Amino acid sequence: MAVSSSSDVIVLSVGIILAALYLFREQIFSAAKPKTVQVPSSKAAAGGNGNPRDFIAKMKEGKKRIVIFYGSQTGTAEEYAIRLAKEAKSKFGLASLVCDPEEYDFENLDQVPEDCCVFFVMATYGEGEPTDNAVQLCQNLSDESFEFSNGEHKLPGLKYVIFGLGNKTYEHYNLISRNVDRDLQKMGAIRIGERGEGDDDKSMEEDYLEWKDGMWEAFAKAMNVEEGQGGDSPDFVVTEVFDHPEEKVYLGELSARALTRTKGIHDAKNPYPAPIIAAKELFAPGSDRNCVHIELSTESSGITYQHGDHVGVWPSNADKEVDRLLYALGLHEKKDTVINIESLDPALAKVPFPVPTTYATVLRHYIDISALAGRQILGVLAKFAPNPEAEAVLKDLNSNKEHYQNIVANGCMKLGEVLQYAAGNDLHADPTASNTTAWKIPFDIIVSSIPRLQPRYYSISSSPKLYPNAIHATVVVLKYKSEKAPRVEERWIYGVGSNFLLNLKYASHHDKAATLVSDDSPSEPSIVSHYPTYSIEGPRGAYKQGDVVKVPIHVRRSTFRLPTNPKSPVIMIGPGTGVAPFRGFVQERVAMARRTIEKHGPEGLADWGPIRLYYGCRRSDQDFLYKDEWPEYAKELHGKFIMRCAFSREPPYKPDGSKIYVQDLIWEDAEQIADAILNGKGYVYICGDAKSMSKSVEETLCRILGEAKGGSAEVEGAAELKLLKERNRLLLDVWS
């Protein structure tokens, strides 16, 4: 209906204004009122109901003499923090507050009582960086302008203990724990014992065990406490349940959302069962290794990714290892019994997985029974041995480091295998009730002693620009030989995640494990081989529905990214499966090139910087990954993509007969690389093995840059490399 007169317009306008004033009266008029802020009383602030970020108040309220802060990216540092808390309780009867530093403020760190101690368990992440949850803590300690409650940047007399977690294959080994230690001492804090440093490249566990005994001795003196004041008390109580609704029992689901299949985001607590679109073997027939290319559908999942991100795959433990431990614990007949688990001290030990669940589910899906059996746990389990002989074996392996190394570590023995070994059982036979001695180990000890089964991360080898509804991964299947030990034959050891994926690949092709690459060859007839199989159906058949096989995944974000400007030169070094993210990088550029050519023709790429890929493998006819794809990408990029390959087991070789690797090709192209980096402001990416390849490549880059600057690799070259890292123009995605 049309408005017929100006008076009608005025009346209508006034009506609208009045209605708006009424509807939004609180927002409009409350702005004029002064806001009142409730300030908690000092008594409330000091208690648990006060500031939740006040760790001092929580220590006092809980009568804790120890506070333990952990900087953890993958959960390992947190596990060691909890172990230290448990040992403080069992040795000295001292209660600890285990804290994620991200959840607390540190202005009152100077208020820690004199009879208390602060522990720091700090992992070094990436290129000498603090873990995400420890960034603020490290900044507060290092920033001299940061003031504690005393108005100064000082911590006089603060007692502390520090243990660092790192990997010697990385340049900045344990840098964060060293920096924290340095900063604390500069502020007048007093370290108890030596600074501990664990090396994940060798044995974090052994480094921890060697450090902790001397630390606890120094701790007892500094804190004026005596060992023996604690006691062995369980962390959990396990109860068998017989009347719980079946649909509410966790059978491998990681969260309530996953159990109820509630719609929501998919993350580490709620992985997405991604259907396998395609899966194929990348190595040539006759190879002694497997490499799986797998394509996973993310359509309608809400999952997004970028080139350079990682896909987290949630594996299960192999069937044989689950059965082995069920028999060794005397639980095989009760494997499907529903159990509930409660923590006796939630502040110290949280139940690490959802409950109620079953014995078999815990061993298959929730804890890492496939890991190397730790020396410390063997001492704990000795008293539950079925006979004196088995007890003596475990005590010896626990106390004798050399025996443990020769038998358990060199033999790559899992906990179930060690229990069989100690009891005199045959490790190589399929476990049964008749050939596996049952131990009377309380299940709560298994839960508290074995860490969670973690996802395995793989570089995504596709670009969302070409594959918006699919994630590709390139996974070499881990298989290596153990060393022969007394009563333990040399045998094949299989990686959990990659062999899980290999099983899924064959299931998606309706093949059996018998079609896998042969484990034995005429030259190695004595190696014991039992290729692992997995229950791939998943909880309640969620991962296999008819002919569709699914993989539980989530995406982990990365900063491993191409420069946004295609004019910047790019240098990528990725031998073996290190080439995986670079396939995604090249696809990203191909997608951009297609759009550019569509608008401006091929000349639109004229000012693009070159994309150089240095790739290496054994043989061009055996393990050259995506061999047929690279020439197609090169065509689409009209000369901007250059690929050089080093084949270590076929000619040409060096003049002295030695093998050619990617770093040799980089040195051959020294002039072009120096020009791309120094004049073209190019970006360098390295992906692959951190032990030797990454170090050798960085050393070669130092030589190239040092010579280009008219100096040496050690001075000018190292300075340029450092500058590249600081400016995020040298990025690494490496593993040991």
Swiss-Prot record:
InterPro entries, sorted: CysJ-like_FAD-binding (IPR003097), FAD-bd_FR_type (IPR017927), Flavdoxin-like (IPR001094), Flavodoxin/NO_synth (IPR008254), Flavoprot_Pyr_Nucl_cyt_Rdtase (IPR001709), Flavoprotein-like_sf (IPR029039), FNR_nucleotide-bd (IPR039261), NADPH_Cyt_P450_Rdtase_alpha (IPR023173)
Cofactor note: Binds 1 FAD per monomer.
GO (cellular component) term, any one: endoplasmic reticulum membrane
An annotated GO BP: ergosterol biosynthetic process
Principal place of residence: endoplasmic reticulum
Cell compartments where the protein resides: Endoplasmic reticulum membrane; Mitochondrion outer membrane; Cell membrane
One GO MF term attached to the UniProt entry: FMN binding
Oxidoreductase among keywords: yes
Residues of the FAD-binding FR-type domain: 269-546
Signal peptide boundaries: none
Regions of this protein lying in the Cytoplasmic compartment: 25-736
Catalytic activity: 2 oxidized [cytochrome P450] + NADPH = 2 reduced [cytochrome P450] + NADP(+) + H(+)
EC numbers: 1.6.2.4
Transmembrane segments: 2-24
Membrane topology of this protein: Single-pass membrane protein
SUPFAM superfamilies linked to this entry: Ferredoxin reductase-like, C-terminal NADP-linked domain (SSF52343), Flavoproteins (SSF52218), Riboflavin synthase domain-like (SSF63380)
Binding-site residues for FMN, renumbered to this chain: 72-77, 123-126, 165-174, 200
PANTHER family: NADPH--CYTOCHROME P450 REDUCTASE (PTHR19384:SF17), NITRIC OXIDE SYNTHASE-RELATED (PTHR19384)
Record-stated family: Belongs to the NADPH--cytochrome P450 reductase family.
HAMAP family linked: NCPR
Function: This enzyme is required for electron transfer from NADP to cytochrome P450 in microsomes. It can also provide electron transfer to heme oxygenase and cytochrome B5. Involved in ergosterol biosynthesis.
Protein name: NADPH--cytochrome P450 reductase
